[in-house]
Amino acid sequence: MSFKSQSIGIIGAPFSKGQPRGGVEEGPTALRKAGLLEKLKEQECDVKDYGDLCFADVPNDTPFQIVKNPRSVGKANQQLADVVAEIKKNGRTSLVLGGDHSMAIGSISGHARVHPDLCVIWVDAHTDINTPLTTTTGNLHGQPVSFLLKELKEKIPEVPGLSWVTPCLSAKDIVYIGLRDVDPAEHYILKTLGIKYFSMIEVDKLGIGKVMEEAFSYLLGRKKRPIHLSFDVDGLDPFFTPATGTPVHGGLSYREGIYITEEIYKTGLLSGLDIMEVNPSLGKTPEEVTRTVNTAVALVLACFGVAREGNHKPIDYLKPPK
């Protein structure tokens, strides 16, 4: 594979209040400790580290109906959106280290401020498209897409802390891969809006190669545009990423996950990346934590050109002997 260096802006989003399980705020630290930045630099990437966001406690963050921590989630996402927009204005690919998946609201909103024509590939066991009125858990990490879709604008009530969010995606701008745990209301939304998805049924039937071909044809067929990849590590089977909050059996294999990211790299269009829901507290053993973190790191590296076939710099390695 040919070698092209890229400039990346990394921002940690150590946030956990979009869901009930502590520990996911440790995700960014775990990914950094695993040498992610050094490995990207080895790949000749120009890496600028924007550090980790600090999230102040929001007092009196009472539920909105059953939606939990709405002001905390809203404020954290506003902070993240501002930094992602800055990274994009500087011409870098944004890399968000989560943190729970509610932070995709800020990541994609900030990205869309600078590249309003972006499209989204969402790799996840779940659609995360419940609205504040359809959610059965009240956890905002199961709702980010509903806040981002223009077609759902009229279905979203005024949630305290989230009134700043302006929907920036149309239903035709997103493709899901890896779905296998979809609520009835979410399935209704997918079908009613005609959202393109490849559940594990389609992955099994078509194979991951055809899935990626069809996803690119659907999103990029008419016009090449920036890709935002939002990757929840629970998209992979829990064998590969056990340390995560909502694991679902029968997921993507390690190889399928890496293939997705390799193919996105090859388009040359990756403009924003989220790697979400790594929760070091939820590994049953230290090895499970290491396995999850190392898998997440490998997914990120493949997005930036680390290829299983190998690669090389554009130099002549076969100079004749002197």
UniProtKB/Swiss-Prot annotation:
Annotated region described as Disordered, given as residue ranges: 1-27
Disulfide bond entries: none
Cofactor note: Binds 2 manganese ions per subunit.
Description of how the protein assembles with itself and partners: Homotrimer. Interacts with CMTM6.
Gene Ontology biological process terms from the UniProt entry: arginine catabolic process to ornithine; urea cycle
Catalytic reaction(s) noted: L-arginine + H2O = urea + L-ornithine
Organism phylogeny: Eukaryota, Metazoa, Chordata, Craniata, Vertebrata
Family: Belongs to the arginase family.
Positions that bind Mn(2+) 1: 101, 124, 128, 232
Involved pathway(s): Nitrogen metabolism; urea cycle; L-ornithine and urea from L-arginine: step 1/1
EC main group: hydrolase
Binding-site residues, Mn(2+) 2: 124, 126, 232, 234
EC nos: 3.5.3.1
GO cellular component terms listed in the entry, alphabetical order: cytoplasm; cytosol
Sites bearing Phosphoserine, chain numbering: 7, 72, 163, 217
NCBIfam families: rocF_arginase
Superkingdom of origin organism: Eukaryota
Keyword terms of this UniProt record: Arginine metabolism, Cytoplasm, Hydrolase, Manganese, Metal-binding, Phosphoprotein, Urea cycle
Record's keyword annotation contains Repeat: no
Protein's name in the database: Arginase-1
Subcellular location: Cytoplasm
Molecular function, one GO term: arginase activity
Modified residues (N6-succinyllysine): 17, 75
Listed cofactors: Mn(2+)
Protein residues bound to substrate: 126-130, 137-139, 183, 246, 277
